[in-house]
Amino acid sequence: MKRTSTASPPYAPRRPRRAAAALAASAAVLAALLTPATAGAAPAPAATGAPLPTELEVIRAAEATALYGDPAERPLDQRKTSLISLGDSQISGEGVGNYEPGTDGPTNWCHRSKDAAVHRTTIPADVTYNVSCSGANSANIRIGGSPQYADELVQSDNLAVKARNTRIKQVLVVAGANDDLQFGPVMTDCVTRYLLLQGACNPKYGPGWQARVDGLVPKVTTTLGDLKKVMADAGYTEGSYELVLMSYSSPITPDFRDNPKFPGKLPGGCVGYDADARWGRDTAVPAFQKGLRAAARDAGATYLDGSRLFQGHEVCTDDTWVRGLTVDLSHPFPPDANSVRQSFHPNGRGHAAFAACLSALHGTGLREASCADPGSTGQAVLRAGAWDDAFGPLRAGTGVCLDAKGGDTLNDTALIGWDCTGTRNQGWWQSPDTGAVHIEATHDRCLDIPGADYRAGRSLVLYDCKGQPDQKFTRTGATLRPAAAPDLCVTLTGKDTPARLQNCDGSAAQSLA
């Protein structure tokens, strides 16, 4: 099926533009870094929707004429099918390049890429729409909200138009980072503090982070409810389309030095303190993810957990799906806040991963699903359920839990027995497909037998998940055994003692509940 990637047409200004204050180039590069630049049969939808306000009806008629040759609102069975994405820079294509005309400055910086995920899925559709915009918050999406730029519609209004001209199959939403969380300004501050040698930023933001998450959840919930109302007003019934909220993945990792070709923080674009990278991955993004999951549940939307999707592919890794710190001194010129706006956003490979997840999710009927690279494959794989429900401790009968020593996740981190704390360096999940045992802190590190040395007494470590035999384990009762050496068991004898392979003997140290 030939698919049309449709750029959002320009609209008559709805309110005066605000003049942007000129900034000194060097100050703008630092201060503006990452600041938001802003299954089963379903009831058939109604033939046509409720009338639109006059202003939107004019736009609808013009778009219908472009699609079909005349302005009539067609019955659903006579319409082209479509997909649509709404939200902020995470899904607009910020950082990918190849931006739609009119969205790459100087008066509109939505940065909608022609290579954004919505245009790259394998879901059969005649038309794909990307109405998301870099910097959008819930006020730019919800009913009665405000447009970001004079030539933009509120995103829910854009949805209302598209829903009456096409038969929408999937509505993708990625939103929340620019509400109370202010993820961009926080990232800006963290990077700026590093460049100016001012110390890590996580002590500043950590204590109030959960309150920020709690503040954004009702806004995202309301926004999703508004989008459902828009679809209902357009004649759609529950279940006749998919409403998907996808969560964000951390663009940074503290494990970048495991990249054998690590070029350095500045050349690689992964500027920031290691402690902040660890806080972002282990605390900030997981808390944000939990909030978005709650919003999707409360609104009755499908939840796609993307929180682990970029793990192993962050900035400065050997196969990055994220653009690092990027400063474009020529566009605009002289440089201003927009010179760095592409930094720390998904690149083309990141959007290909989004598209793979969305394609796999379509038509499954799942209310919750999650997506990640199963182990340095370069491919995104979907699984049913959210990641939060997958991980749990491996608690030995001796009373200790399998623990990544010091909370580290670098290659060759020692694994030990330790007091059970419920932290992410003690959470584990075994893939039913590969047998690999992933640690909760990052999907890119697995339980590993160094050198495939299958002998009693061999200590175990964390290592880059690679799908090799030395990372494949089986469960026999409560024991965990190497698939290649089933007479050996993972053994935890006590606190601060190494996790080792020992001959299986039925002891409490080998009973991992």
Model-derived features with residue positions:
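Serine-esterase "nucleophile elbow" of acetyl-processing enzymes
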Residues: 62-134, 191-192
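Histidine-centered active-site loop/cap adjacent to the catalytic His
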Residues: 327-376
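Extracellular glycan-recognition/adhesion modules and their associated mucin-like linkers
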Residues: 379-410, 424-454, 470-496, 511-513
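Secretory targeting and sorting signals
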Residues: 1-46
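Structural recognition of the beta-strand scaffold that forms the well-ordered cores
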Residues: 82-94, 127-132, 169-174, 179-181, ...
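C-terminal region of N-terminal signal peptides and the immediate post-cleavage residues
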Residues: 31-71, 367-368, 459
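Short, well-structured alpha-helical segments in soluble
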Residues: 144-166
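Alpha-helical cap/lid subdomain in secreted, periplasmic
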Residues: 160-328
